[in-house]
Curated annotation (Swiss-Prot):
Name of the protein in question: L-cystine-binding protein TcyJ
Regulation: The TcyJLN system is inhibited by L-cystine, L-cysteine, DL-2,6-diaminopimelic acid and L-cystathionine, and is stimulated by D-cysteine.
InterPro entries (UniProt xref): Iontro_rcpt_C, SBP_3_CS, Solute-binding_3/MltF_N
Role summary: Part of the ABC transporter complex TcyJLN involved in L-cystine import. This high affinity cystine transporter is involved in resistance to oxidative stress by forming a L-cysteine/L-cystine shuttle system with the EamA transporter, which exports L-cysteine as reducing equivalents to the periplasm to prevent the cells from oxidative stress. Exported L-cysteine can reduce the periplasmic hydrogen peroxide to water, and then generated L-cystine is imported back into the cytoplasm via the TcyJLN complex. Functions at low cystine concentrations.
Induction: Transcription is controlled by CysB. Expression is highly induced by H(2)O(2). Induced by sulfate. Also slightly induced by exogenous L-cysteine.
């Protein structure tokens, strides 16, 4: 009898431990990144800060641009503030991996390869890869084949570099870890063309007093989304819900019209 009683006690003890363990696991799972962001009161956003019109320093020295304002509005919809973390592109995803930032908002193109490692929000801009040349050389590049034999500048580790290496043979690929140097090399003739976001290209032509020019049609369709570490479904859902709200209430279109003079969100 005593043995039976002890057996029942042992069984009840095991069940109690299992129940507590189960509750602990559930509680830990519920403590996701979204909760941490809300407890902190800030969303840590990685962006370049040297990539007009998306993110750059204004005359007052403060960061401004389409993606700066988008990040601020996104954070507002989450009930927090955006803490902007300027980072060079070639180290930005590493910063995301190491949890120094929560998200990347930097015209990150959604691709099958990137989706293997990162989660992406629904797209918030639609664009394409555009060739930009020195003013007067517009006729030199009309199609991707015209890039053959030319010195073409691209951001190091960007989808522009990936696309160029995969789709054009016989091109002299020059990589850059910052945009100003790339633009300067194009102006002085060290390279023949650069590949950039179509939206950035149109803005850049205006800001450089027409010393540069867009040439040919955009080479491919690009959808950009907010990049997150995998496994943070709570924050991903909140970001997607916020983007949907911004599309519905007109916030996203208003930002697009302000910075590009057109709706580039669809």
């Amino acid at each position: 009898m005593k043995l039976a009683h002890l057996g029942r006690q042992a069984l009840m003890g095991v069940m109690a431990v299992a129940l507590v363990a189960g509750m602990s696991v559930k509680s830990f799972a519920d403590e996701g990144l979204l909760n941490k962001v809300k407890e902190r009161g800030t969303l840590l956003v990685g962006l370049e800060g040297t990539y007009p019109p998306f993110s750059f320093q204004g005359d007052d020295g403060k960061l401004t641009g389409f993606e700066v304002e988008f990040a601020q509005q996104l954070a507002k919809h989450l009930g927090v503030e955006a803490s902007l973390k300027p980072t060079k592109w070639d180290g930005m995803l590493a910063s995301l991996d190491s949890k120094r930032i929560d998200v990347v908002i930097n015209q990150v193109t959604i691709s099958d390869e990137r989706k293997k490692k990162y989660d992406f929000s629904t797209p918030y801009t639609i664009s394409g890869i555009q060739a930009l040349v020195k003013k007067g050389n517009e006729g030199t590049i009309k199609t991707a084949d015209d890039l053959k034999g030319k010195k073409v500048g691209v951001g190091l580790g960007t989808n522009y570099e990936e696309w160029l290496r995969q789709n054009v043979q016989g091109v002299d690929v020059r990589t850059y870890d910052d945009d100003p140097t790339k633009y300067q090399d194009l102006r002085v003739g060290r390279i023949d063309a650069i590949l950039v976001d179509r939206l950035a290209a149109l803005d850049l032509v205006k800001k450089t007093n027409d010393t540069l020019a867009v040439t040919g049609e955009a080479f491919s369709r690009q959808e950009s989304g907010v990049a997150l570490r995998k496994g943070n479904e709570d924050l991903l859902k909140a970001v997607n819900d916020a983007i949907a709200e911004m599309q519905k209430d007109g916030t996203l279109q208003a930002l697009s019209e302000k910075w590009f003079g057109a709706d580039v969100t669809k």
